[in-house]
Amino acid sequence: MQRRPILVVNFGSQYVQLIARRVRELGVYSEIVHWDTPVEEIKKKNPYGIIFSGGPASVYAEGAPLPDKRIYELGVPILGICYGLQVITHQLGGKVVRSEKQEYGRARLRIIKEDVIFEGIPKESDVWMSHADKVVELPEGFEVLAVSENSPYAVIANREKKIYGFQFHPEVTHTVFGKEMLANFIYGVCKAEKNWEMGDFIHEKIEEIRKTVGDAKVIAALSGGVDSTVAAVLTHRAIGDKLHCFFIDHGLLRYKEREEVEKNLRSLGLPLTVVDASEEFLEKLKGVEDPEEKRKIIGRTFIEVFEREAKKIEGAEFLLQGTLYPDVVESAGIKGSAKIKTHHNVGGLPERMNLKLLEPFRELFKDEVRKIGKLLGVPEEILRRHPFPGPGLAIRIIGEVNKKDLEILRKADYIFIQELKKEGLYDRVWQAFAVLLPVKSVGVMGDVRTYEKVVALRAVESVDGMTADWARLPYDFLDRVMRRIINEVEGVNRVVYDISSKPPSTIEWE
């Protein structure tokens, strides 16, 4: 079903996906498009409205990302956020310059003219600013609706053409009434109608899967994580036992994870084949220390094992994947963005095995997949699982992977997670895990000098994993975890806690 969207034009903002998510939370379908998307393509999508995202560039710089000017002639309401406001100002004849006083962080917004965009919002409220450039001259037909101490053009509008600009970020939680302002733009200015409901999505997707697959068979490699599990449950609901699921144990799983995943997947009625390929993976990882090389070896071996097993299923024409909208957006990318890490999935498999891809969630965010899982009756313990990387513990052992170190890490990680759950902290963090470091340290245990391994604990808070802050866990709690690990895990005599945020660090160590 073709839904009328609110289009979010991406100028390279770290918040672009957050904007799209906020729109969907308000009940309207949103889609992200690149800033140089042709106007004809935008027109075809028949959007209710368009939101220009922020971005790191300066509109007056050479080669700055600027959309086709004909976008303003479509008669579609536009909202520019931060850099987006400056794009509108610059392209329509106003002036933007470098600000001598840059504005980052909380600011006080003061409304000076009433407008539908401020419906239900107090005269003064806190907003979040993040800009180094400023507007000094408005385009013809525009007026100022709100100001802040350092931004005399905090909210601008051409009311006749329904073009608005916010110098602040309404999508972040620090802007107290940001969601309400977005709702006012969507419903008050764009006159959009609600068209995004997870229950409707499930019914439509089941029909679509049935039509797409027909009498063919579908194969899936499941990890036990949220995305692949919910995708399998939805597909199984649509086509029954024409779906064949595989769980490959690569020997790099957490403590008792294989048994837990198998139990969970079978309890959901999924047709499952469990493959133990642990020796094969560990053999190929012998002597390998480089993290990128480890990821590649695991990815290649995974494909070989899965291909070998899947060939046993006659009539398989589709490969089910739990691809999400952020994966689609990131693979489209903003020109010039750098690859940070190789992502481990079954990439390359469809071509090799002559399979077509089935990606029921390619237009969804992770929180939406969780909502679907809930509606499909997937147990909370699966939906609340922390993300776990495809290469498993191999990228949490810094350096070469061997059975002894895997055993040490499994035990330490299990204690950490167990204590988080016991203390009611597990659901408060986005991800938590232990890392085994390639260093030894001197210690004293029972009056005897020791020289043993160091374990690092990592816990982060995040919304989508794209940015993350280290979790401020209570000292008493960390003390208890440290004592348990050192007393119960042979070969460890020191525990440290990682307090790095993303950026500059990544969540995983490798």
From Swiss-Prot:
Catalytic function, reaction form: XMP + L-glutamine + ATP + H2O = GMP + L-glutamate + AMP + diphosphate + 2 H(+)
GO cellular component: cytosol
One function term, GO molecular function aspect: GMP synthase activity
Disulfide bonds: none
Pathway: Purine metabolism; GMP biosynthesis; GMP from XMP (L-Gln route): step 1/1
InterPro entries: Class_I_gatase-like (IPR029062), GATASE (IPR017926), GMP_synth_C (IPR001674), GMP_synth_GATase (IPR004739), GMP_synthase (IPR022955), GMPS_ATP_PPase_dom (IPR025777), NAD/GMP_synthase (IPR022310), Rossmann-like_a/b/a_fold (IPR014729)
UniProt cross-references to SUPFAM superfamilies, sorted A to Z: Adenine nucleotide alpha hydrolases-like, Class I glutamine amidotransferase-like, GMP synthetase C-terminal dimerisation domain
Residues annotated to bind ATP: 223-229
EC number: 6.3.5.2
Residue ranges occupied by any Glutamine amidotransferase type-1 domain in the UniProt entry: 5-195
One Gene Ontology biological process: GMP biosynthetic process
Active site, UniProt feature: 82, 169, 171
Domain of life: Bacteria
Listed transmembrane segments: none
Subunit-level organization: Homodimer.
Name of the protein in its database record: GMP synthase [glutamine-hydrolyzing]
Organism, as annotated: Aquifex aeolicus (strain VF5)
